[in-house]
Amino acid sequence: MRLRNKPWAADLIAENPDMILVSPENIASNWQSRFAKEQPIYIEVGSGKGQFITQMAQKYPDRNFIAVEIQESAIAVILQKQVELKLPNLQLLLGNGAALTTFFAENEVAGVYLNFSDPWPKTRHEKRRLTYKSFLAEYQQIMQPTGYLRFKTDNQGLFEYSLASLNAYGMVFDDISLDLHNSDLAEDNIQTEYEEKFSKRGQVIYRLEAHYK
């Protein structure tokens, strides 16, 4: 979902280079230098307004997190939160999730989160889905051998597509939930803004976790 333009976004981003990078060219393999401690790095591709990634950073201080978002207006909202929170284990990246291998080195990432990604329902837009094979190849290249991919959505069609796509790519499923909020995983689940809103309306949330062979 595209947010309304925020006239103040560009200035806020320019004022906080220690918290956010804009399509950097020389950051691959150097992300640890941007954090207070050298810890495993986890990224969320398509972070929206940032509720998930900021709460994850607060809950897991022994991990480093990077919010990857292509919309300036969206990442500016996350940056507002980070300016206030000043979490030492959170960095922001304004950039295209289709270019992750430009921003991250091989084996630099311990895990990838995809939360409520745009389903791009039309067949001609299949290549834009974040679980399309070209994206899976991007994640694989930057992920450590022990890393994982976690994906949540309320869109049944996208979930079924993603199961088929990951399976065709040769990934191994560690967990599949057809009703996350009524499963054993619900207690530790950190919700996105979107997830919170629609789960209250009774919308079923789907989740999977998988790794590369």
Swiss-Prot record:
Active site: 118
Nuclease as UniProt keyword: no
Keywords of this entry: Methyltransferase, S-adenosyl-L-methionine, Transferase, tRNA processing
Catalytic activity: guanosine(46) in tRNA + S-adenosyl-L-methionine = N(7)-methylguanosine(46) in tRNA + S-adenosyl-L-homocysteine
Pfam families recorded: Methyltransf_4
Pathway note: tRNA modification; N(7)-methylguanine-tRNA biosynthesis
Cystine bridges: none
Region spans: Interaction with RNA: 124-129
EC number assigned by the record: 2.1.1.33
One GO cellular component, as annotated: tRNA methyltransferase complex
InterPro entries cross-referenced by the UniProt entry: SAM-dependent_MTases_sf (IPR029063), tRNA_(Gua-N-7)_MeTrfase_Trmb (IPR003358), tRNA_methyltr_TrmB_bact (IPR055361)
Binding site for S-adenosyl-L-methionine: 44, 69, 96, 118
UniProt GO MF annotations: tRNA (guanine(46)-N7)-methyltransferase activity
Source superkingdom: Bacteria
Binding annotation for substrate: 122, 154, 192-195
Matching NCBIfam families: PRK00121.2-2 (NF001080), tRNA (guanosine(46)-N7)-methyltransferase TrmB (TIGR00091)
Function: Catalyzes the formation of N(7)-methylguanine at position 46 (m7G46) in tRNA.
Family indicated by similarity: Belongs to the class I-like SAM-binding methyltransferase superfamily. TrmB family.
Protein known as: tRNA (guanine-N(7)-)-methyltransferase
